[in-house]
Design a protein with these regions (language model features):
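Flexible, acidic/Gly-rich N-terminal and inter-domain linker regions that tether
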Residues: 1-58
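Conserved Radical SAM active-site core
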Residues: 55-66, 70-127
Length: 127
């Protein structure tokens, strides 16, 4: 970050925390084109995200909430109910982890993991 003035770098270091969710597990499909990760947030809540290799590049499916309040009978995310919304940083963190794992550019992001994105609209929109 040497492009920023020294006093700004000092202020950022003193006042800002930059952290990613912790990678817990990674599963890779037999064809190598799909990866699923389980990540843990700073409060020990966990969500899954998926990376899919498409003909146009990499697409990431992220979660927007821990759990879900919608009650859809076909979805496992709703079984424990809604725990909380993910923050903007936690949503972005899922994408950043895949970028680091693949060393490739992520071409698209789909918000369709755990949770109902419209119930966390502001954070999803900012992410």
């Amino acid at each position: 970050m040497t492009q920023f003035p020294k006093d700004l770098r000092q202020w950022l270091g003193d006042n800002c925390v930059i952290s990613l969710p912790t990678l817990i597990t990674e599963s890779i499909a037999p064809d190598g084109k799909t990866r699923k990760i389980l990540v843990e947030m700073s409060d020990q809540s966990r969500v899954e995200a998926v990376l899919m290799e498409q003909h146009y590049g990499y697409s990431v499916c992220v979660s927007s909430q821990v759990g879900c309040a919608m009650g859809c009978v076909f979805c496992a995310s709703t079984q424990g109910g809604l725990y909380r919304d993910l923050t903007v940083a936690e949503i972005i963190g899922q994408v950043v982890i895949f970028g680091a794992l693949t060393k490739e550019e992520i071409h698209s992001v789909v918000v369709m993991g755990a949770g109902e994105p419209l119930q966390n609209y502001d954070n999803v929109l900012q992410a």
